[in-house]
């Protein structure tokens, strides 16, 4: 006898492990659907965005983004204050932010709506909606010239109201 022994081991196939991970990932995916206004053009966006749109206006093109993050993603105060900073305004307390927010309801549920305008810098204003869902937060943000806010606000509102979970 040479001392050689044959041993048999049963191991899971790598493909099976990979498929289990893929299936688990698919079960946890979160996808949305919406109704887009006819004049908006979907464009390739930043990798953090779920979707991006060019929103035409008389003063140029607005930039609309939809992003989603797990949890509260910094909360309303941190996000609104970041947006205020982007248009040259000072941060606000949570109490003051609540005074400038509007509560709305759409197909995805209740959300907070914001119209942020710096009267001294009208090149960029922001319309934004924050949907705080059970396990994640959805942000819809439109950066556009302040002179065009009134012209696009109805389409933005209808768009936000149309957002729902896909599937």
Model-derived regions: residue spans:
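N-terminal targeting sequences that direct proteins away from the cytosol to non-cytosolic compartments
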Residues: 1-62, 69-113, 118-123, 127, ...
């Amino acid at each position: 006898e040479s001392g050689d022994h044959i041993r048999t081991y049963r191991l899971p196939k790598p493909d099976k492990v990979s498929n289990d991970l893929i299936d688990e990932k698919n079960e946890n995916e979160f996808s949305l659907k919406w109704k887009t206004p006819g004049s908006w053009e979907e464009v390739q966006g930043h990798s953090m965005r779920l979707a991006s749109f060019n929103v035409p206006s008389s003063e140029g093109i607005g930039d609309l983004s939809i992003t989603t993050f797990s949890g509260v993603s910094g909360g309303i105060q941190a996000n609104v204050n970041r947006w205020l900073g982007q248009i040259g305004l000072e941060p606000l307390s949570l109490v003051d932010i609540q005074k400038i927010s509007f509560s709305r309801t759409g197909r995805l549920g209740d959300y907070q709506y914001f119209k942020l305008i710096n009267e001294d810098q009208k090149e960029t204003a922001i319309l934004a909606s924050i949907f705080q869902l059970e396990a994640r937060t959805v942000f819809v943000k439109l950066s556009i010239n302040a002179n065009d806010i009134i012209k696009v606000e109805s389409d933005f509102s209808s768009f936000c109201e149309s957002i729902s979970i896909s599937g």
